[in-house]
C-alpha cells in the first residue's frame, strides 16, 4: 500500500524515515500514546481507520490492539505545522499503554501545580 504522493511530500521524516504519531482519545481529549509511523503505516491507517504503527525494535508494522484487543479506531488524522508529527483522533478500546494503563502518561509527574 502506498501513501498518496501529495501527503508524502508534506512529511518531514527523521533519519530512519519515520514521523512521530500521537494518539488522542476523541471522547475525553486525553493524550494516549506516542509511536512511530513510516509512509506505509500512515497509508494503512488512512485506508483502514485502524491505527497502524511501525515498531523500531521489531522492525515491523503493528496494528494497535491486534493481539491485546485494545484497539484504536481512527476518526481523524492531522499533520502538524512542521510536517514531522501526525495526530490521530481515536476511539480507544481498553488500555492504550502497553503497561495496561489508560495512557502512557499515567505514571511519573515531573512537574505539577502546587497543592
UniProtKB/Swiss-Prot annotation:
Enzyme superclass (EC): hydrolase
Coiled coil location: none
SUPFAM superfamilies in alphabetical order: HisI-like (SSF141734)
Cofactor(s) the record lists: Mg(2+); Zn(2+)
Keywords tagged on the record: Amino-acid biosynthesis, Cytoplasm, Histidine biosynthesis, Hydrolase, Magnesium, Metal-binding, Zinc
Family matches, as Pfam families: PRA-CH
EC number: 3.5.4.19
InterPro entries reported for this sequence: PRA-CH, PRib_AMP_CycHydrolase_dom, PRib_AMP_CycHydrolase_sf
Residue sites binding Mg(2+) per the record: 80, 82, 84
Swiss-Prot/TrEMBL catalytic activity: 1-(5-phospho-beta-D-ribosyl)-5'-AMP + H2O = 1-(5-phospho-beta-D-ribosyl)-5-[(5-phospho-beta-D-ribosylamino)methylideneamino]imidazole-4-carboxamide
GO biological process, one term: L-histidine biosynthetic process
Pathway: Amino-acid biosynthesis; L-histidine biosynthesis; L-histidine from 5-phospho-alpha-D-ribose 1-diphosphate: step 3/9
GO annotations of cellular component type: cytoplasm
Gene3D superfamilies on file: Phosphoribosyl-AMP cyclohydrolase
Main location per the UniProt record: cytoplasm
GO molecular function terms noted in the UniProt entry: magnesium ion binding; phosphoribosyl-AMP cyclohydrolase activity; zinc ion binding
Assembly and binders: Homodimer.
Summary of the function given for this chain in its UniProt record: Catalyzes the hydrolysis of the adenine ring of phosphoribosyl-AMP.
Protein family (similarity comment): Belongs to the PRA-CH family.
Record's protein name: Phosphoribosyl-AMP cyclohydrolase
Origin species: Nocardia farcinica (strain IFM 10152)
Gene from which this protein is expressed: hisI
Amino acid at each position: 500500500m502506498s501513501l498518496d504522493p501529495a501527503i508524502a511530500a508534506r512529511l518531514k521524516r527523521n533519519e530512519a524515515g519515520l514521523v512521530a504519531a500521537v494518539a488522542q482519545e476523541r471522547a475525553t481529549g486525553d493524550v494516549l500514546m506516542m509511536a512511530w509511523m513510516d509512509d506505509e503505516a500512515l497509508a494503512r491507517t488512512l485506508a483502514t481507520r485502524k491505527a497502524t504503527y511501525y515498531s523500531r525494535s521489531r522492525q515491523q508494522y503493528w496494528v494497535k490492539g491486534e493481539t491485546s484487543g485494545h484497539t484504536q479506531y481512527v476518526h481523524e488524522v492531522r499533520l502538524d505545522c512542521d510536517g514531522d508529527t501526525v495526530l490521530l483522533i481515536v476511539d480507544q478500546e481498553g488500555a492504550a499503554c502497553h503497561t495496561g494503563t489508560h495512557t502512557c502518561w499515567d505514571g511519573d509527574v515531573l512537574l505539577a501545580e502546587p497543592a
